[in-house]
Amino acid sequence: MDLSARENIYLNGALLGYSKDFINEHFDEIVEFAEVEKFLDMPLKNYSSGMVSRIAFAIATVIVPEILVVDEVLSVGDFMFQKKCENRITQLIEEHGVTVLIVSHSNEQIARLCNKAIWIEKGHTRLIGDAHDVALVYGGLGGRTGSKQSEDYVFQALVNSTAVHDASKCRVIGADSTCATGAKLVFESFGAEKIHNFVLAVDNTHINAIVGNGLAGALHAPLLSTGGVDRLADSSRNVLFEMKPDAIYLLDISGVAPAVFDELKNLPWQPDVQKIGEDDTRTEFSKKVFKCGLDRSLWGSSLAYIDFSDNAEAFAAAPFCYKHGIPVLMPEVSEDGSGMVEECAKAINARTVYEFGDNGVNAVETTNLNDSCHITCIGSSGRADSCFEISRYVYEDFDQLGPSGFVCFTSLNNFQWPELQTCGSYCSMISAPLFLMDDRSLDNESRCLSFLNDNKDNIESILIIGDKNGLDTLDQQLLASALA
């Protein structure tokens, strides 16, 4: 490494069988490609690994070989030079028919440059075939954890998805913004139906939508986010002008949207506008929404209790609560919600209290309820498993009412939540459960895929909620393949 770059070019050339005359003839070409003109006389030991690789690649490709082996060379160096090397490789393949063997950990690079690929793991061939298909399967497992059994299941599902999947089995419902996605869901689920009531949830917090979901169901009303606290988003405003509801309920737990309330009061057809919430705690807000339904004799004989830490579970339960018009109670983090449950249960002579998720069980089970009231706890340890159990419960409940042929899927990722505020009403209207899939967990993915496969005779289509923040194309293809 004490040699200069100039000397190293001749040494490497000799090791590759190039004569000194050959190197002399192509020296300028090698230096120009490697872009090291200013550093030729610098000791190679002072070069970065990327600069060393530049020289090695330039020397190796100065001729047109029969076989070119590129072993991780493209993993170092800057992006522009990597692109330059890829262009040289493509030229050798397309213009000269050179066989190129690339050893790389870059999934995208293999799919881009190769037509065949071998996935070698721990010295053994795990998969061989079309480069795009191998890269897809490799990428589908990358970054995801789970049991060996789940990994094998998802691996085989990924392999199958490259061979057989019906794209028509999977449809994405999304738009440019979260509010626009919600508007699209409202139009798809209610269509031209005359709407008498409408529930708007101020979207500074998803609590408004979660707690208001049962009220919207009892009113048979669309639920949509406002899209802001200073004014209605254009998409939300357009929905209101299209449907012209007689009454609008604005849910604003924090009392941060007086401007939206004023905007609603000034709508040209002059709907009755009621605002619920004013710098409330979650317990206070839950009680206010409950009282609103109680005063209108909307509630049946069921309650739903969801702990604040079970937010994802609340979205999974939303279609069920909407379908049956069940009031949703959510306490403060520091509060024991048993008192609120007991008070509301007595007010409607509750026969069933549903506890969704794993964190509110103690509060519900310690509530002093009458003997005729049944407690149903639906959930599991771990957010992903808990959401799955709730969604499966909803599927079975809806199936008893008559299968619709639809299931909805979305991502468990927190970034997806703003798009899910309207999902309770949408999924309920089409009688579809909402599965929140954790695309980082092989265990959860395998459970979702197994569920689809077990029920494929009754499922016509998978509806993917959300676009930019939702499940990616690979996940969509994987889900669709489970129905094949």
Model-predicted regions and their roles:
Residues 10, 22-39, 58:
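Conserved ABC ATPase "signature" region
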Residues 113-130, 138:
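H-loop (His-switch) and adjacent beta-strand-loop-beta switch element
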Residues 61-70, 76:
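A short, proline-enriched helix->beta-strand linker immediately N-terminal to the Walker B motif
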